[in-house]
Amino acid sequence: PERFAATTDTLYLVSQEGPGSAAPLVAALTAAILDSAVADAGHTAGGRLPVPLVLVLDEAANVCRIRSLPDKYSYYGGMGIVITTVLQSYAQGVQAWGEAGIRKMWSAANVKIYLGGVSERGFLDDVSALIGDHRVQEISQTHSQGAQWSRSIGSRSERILDVADLAALPLGRALVFSSGNRPTLIRTLPWWEGPHADAIRASMAAHGPGIDLPTPR
């Protein structure tokens, strides 16, 4: 871990969940690399790594459950350590780190991305509140016995995206929450439609026999 943290190399740690899983080993090795990177950053004048360390913790709750992650999440960025934590749902994060722990991570993250497919009402209501409200114009007309009409114009506040909208977010869309900016609705780009699709297919064919490769549309 000490040697790797000081290099520009790439390390892939792969495991499955369930009995006999190497997940504890993956978590321990990742934590050791993080500790080494923190120590290296402490030896620099600015307290930051000269070359950022980027960790992409896919399925973090299943195969890379580092207990201390919530408590350290907020200051890693200042050391040049960039962490992306990928979870299937907010509830999965609660199961792994507890309600307080996952809230720490959610609050400390400079960029948060919601990809849909979640039906947790409490979480979705929080997300809806972060997106905010907009004003909806209302026009009403009344008719009196004297055959006179009166018209009034007002407005009311309405959620931009309510819980039902977020639960039904279409495939290929995502919401991005970044520090200092309003939430943004984006279109995602599947890897098989991107510029590196051929290289990825070749790698999967060579190193992942039996994998069903997506067919371009």
Describe each model-derived feature in a short phrase.
Residues 1-81, 164-185, 190, 194-195, ...:
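P-loop NTPase motor domains
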